[in-house]
Amino acid sequence: MDWHSFRIAALLLTSLVVLEVNSEFQIQVRDHNAKNGTIKWHSIRRQKREWIKFAAACREGEDNSKRNPIAKIHSDCAANQPVTYRISGVGIDQPPYGIFIINQKTGEINITSIVDREVTPFFIIYCRALNAQGQDLENPLELRVRVMDINDNPPVFSMTTFLGQIEENSNANTLVMKLNATDADEPNNLNSMIAFKIIRQEPSDSPMFIINRKTGEIRTMNNFLDREQYSQYSLVVRGSDRDGGADGMSAESECSITILDVNDNIPYLEQSSYDITIEENALHSQLVQIRVIDLDEEFSDNWKAIIFFISGNEGNWFEIEMNERTNVGTLKVVKPLDYEAMKNLQLSIGVRNVAEFHQSIISQYRLTATMVTVTVLNVIEGSVFRPGSKTFVVDSRMEANHRVGEFVATDLDTGRASTNVRYEMGNNPENLLVVDSRTGIITLRNRVTMEQYQRLNGEYKGTVLSIDDSLQRTCTGTIVIELSGTGWVTGSESGGSSSGSGDDRDRVTNGYQGTSSTENPQRVTGSWGGSGIDGTRPNTNPFQGDPDETLETPLYGDNVHFGPAGIGLLIMGFLVLGLVPFLLICCDCGGAPGGGAGFEPVPECSDGAIHTWAVEGPQPEPHEGITTICVPQMPPGNANVIEYIDNSGVYTNEYCGREMQDLGGGERTTGFELMDGVKTSAAPEICQEYSGTLRRNSMRECRDGGLNMNFMESYFCQKAYAYADEDEGRPSNDCLLIYDIEGVGSPAGSVGCCSFIGEDLDESFLDTLGPKFKKLADISLGKEIDSYPDSDPSWPPQSTEPMCPQHTEPLGSGHPPISPHFGTTTVISENAYHSGPGVQHPVPIPDPLGYGNVTVRESYTTSGTLKPSVHFHDNQQASNVVVTERVVGPISGADLHGMLEIPDLRGGANVIVTERVIAPGSSLPTSLTIPNPQETSNVVVTERVIQPTSGMIGNLSMTPELSSAHNVIVTERVVSGAGMSEIAGTAGLGGVGGIGSSGLVSTTMGASGTGLNMGGTATIGHMRSSSDHHFSQTVGSASPSMARSRITKYNTVQYSK
């Protein structure tokens, strides 16, 4: 190689390059002028152009104005002419507006606002250079401005809570789930690079999971996951950008991991062994409950168990039924056990799950047997046929009563033939066989005929019953007879011994059923149903066995026919039917007597209306005075009647339901009422030895009668109301009227305390009333009205009469009633005492003792200035006393001195006090006593009016001592006065405590006056041995309004409101 030449060539090349770089190329262009024909050369020099300056990058989230201008554009045309620069694009004339601006003269581009890379990663600016005419001097230029990213966005997980699941005992590094998180910063940048980390685990015993830092995959750390220990885990995972750097942003999310169950627990029984006892031949649906324990998830196939027999149940005597809800197995006995064959059984059972065992424990499973000891108890079993079927052969040569064989039941307890059973034929086709009831020997009833052979088709099948009456058990054995041979006789040759004409008694005894026929062409075919035979008695139905088998029995004709007598009766019946229309035409029940059509209307208020009495027949006549008498002696043969009833102890006090029954040889009563209030109900009995008439009372205890006691009581109460209203609505001619307002109902003259009494003292109307008041009072009180009042004050006795016990039959004799005693009537018409200026001695009113029906008309007393004492004597033994008015009043300011006493009516019966008026003048003595009847019965006090004045000082006592009173009525008590300073005391109605008292009626007590203060207590007691009831009533200062009394029925106590 010639190195010298090489050096020369290299040197020349280097010189050429240097010359090229440092030299300036010039191009001359010839300019030919065609006009003058001259040529001019111009030299052109090539220079480098500057049109654009590259734009600087912008950072997001910062103020980039310090970098302005971020770009500058320039055109070479600006040297020859003015150039205008303009820009357009996103951030300029497109949203977002106004981010970039340009200097149109210099071409500098500036940024004016903060940009966001997540909104606009970069900007493209279109630049133009325009001349003065707006034409483009250069081609449009694209200027790209990139926005630099900053870490301003944290990672975001796609789910708040991630759910995952994994089976327990899973291998290590098994994928559970994968987390997903994103970052809005620039991709493939450190700002968007996320790193995952588990920061918390619950339960926090030991870490069980790991996570991939880059991908977010969660995997198992080991294979120790156990659902029975922890069925669920909760993880908290954190994701941080900038690859988990300290300056990165982070976010957290939860992960819930469920541990799935696998069959990794071997089930076992609750008990290690079981002992049970069962009777032989018994079937049990619930012999024993076997509980299985499994720790796997409940109600899953891993938890459900199956108990099976390992050994001991070779005969399939037992079954085990599992309950899938409780995992409990029930041991059942499905086949009877025999004590003689097996006294004890050893069952070996095992348990497993429905699902297969998990591979982690399949090598550890070992079958464990649980022993079940079954003890069989011996019972008396009775008999059974062994074998259950026997076959015999019968040929045509066997005659009647030929022994076919024997079929004997075997006693299961002893294994020998039973001796305490009886045998009967069950299903016995053709009634062919007979069995001995004691020995079980089977014989032919009759010789087998050809007809029977043909119907049986050469083979007989029947049943034999073995009945044990002591055990009430029945067993059945089957008999099969093969009919072999030839030469079977016909029915005529067998001597009429076919089944159709056999002995009916045998047929009933042996339970015939089957098919039979005779030579009679008339047959009836039907189905006969049999009833089974229980263990206590044999079946007496002659047809038993299969109810669907057909029985053919002969139907024999008779000579019954329709004779002439029957034809005649039939014709006569048709003739009678033909007369019916004619009789209807002739009957005038459908029209008026004059021949008019239509039915006659029933007249109103005729005898066909409903009667007011409660018994059939005509209106009963009132029977007064019929005495109820009990016969003291009875015939010794009657056991249904009481021995005696004292005739003085029977007392009736009812108005409702009276009946008299004449039984023609015996009397009957259904109710009695004793004087002391005890009622006795007697069952209706008949005495055959005595005759007479008794009275029956339909009382509350005996409601068998036609009358309703509630209705009758309501009726009489309404009557009492009507009488009370009528009495109160009358003109004020029989009572004392008090008026508070002048001019309303008061006299027109001068008003004084006694100015209007004169009109009220006219008692002439009492002359015409008579005993009406007494009867009205008796009706209101519910007492019986006697035609002849008893003047004996001791009647009724308190406790001497015997009580008729319930459900007894007192007898009445036929003697006439005993006439009662008659008393005299004393009438005191009027006694008036006028006071003068002198001294007047007290004048007593004579007290008639021992009289009955006493009527005190009027007592009027006035006193002078010396104030003498006035004394009214009491009627000590008066009966049926009527006190209409008692008026005590001084004249023109006269005063009463001493004791003002109104006599008592002790011992009086049926006392009526209509008014008691005390109207003193200026003063009254210190004590004012209104005595009260203590031993009276049926007392009626309608009004008590007291008008004291200011001079009355002391105690005012109106305390009736009605300890033995009956049917007491107090309608009104009015206490009033003008100008009173004070009246203090106690007003009471007592002594009606409940021994012998009945029917009390009390009304209000009014008091008025200036400064009047009056307090009292009214005490009311129940009657008829009932408990005492107390009613408190305080009398204060109130307006003396006129109280209207209404009688109210409250059990046996009457009171007014």
Swiss-Prot record:
InterPro entries in the cross-refs: Cadherin-domain_protein, Cadherin-like_dom, Cadherin-like_sf, Cadherin_CS, Cadherin_Y-type_LIR, Catenin-bd_sf, Desmosomal_cadherin
Region listing for Disordered, in residue ranges: 490-552
Residues exposed to the Extracellular side: 50-564
Annotated signal sequence range: 1-23
PANTHER family in UniProt: DESMOGLEIN FAMILY MEMBER (PTHR24025), DESMOGLEIN-1 (PTHR24025:SF9)
Membrane topology, record value: Single-pass type I membrane protein
Record's keyword annotation contains Nuclease: no
Glycan attachment points: N110, N180
A family per Pfam: CADH_Y-type_LIR
Repeat region (Desmoglein repeat), residues: 832-858, 859-888, 889-918, 919-946, 947-975
Annotated protein name in UniProt: Desmoglein-1-alpha
Keywords: Calcium, Cell adhesion, Cell junction, Cell membrane, Cleavage on pair of basic residues, Cytoplasm, Glycoprotein, Membrane, Metal-binding, Nucleus, Repeat, Signal, Transmembrane, Transmembrane helix
Localization per record: Cell membrane; Cell junction, Desmosome; Cytoplasm; Nucleus
The organism's taxonomic lineage, starting at the top: Eukaryota, Metazoa, Chordata, Craniata, Vertebrata
Listed Polar residues bias regions: 510-525
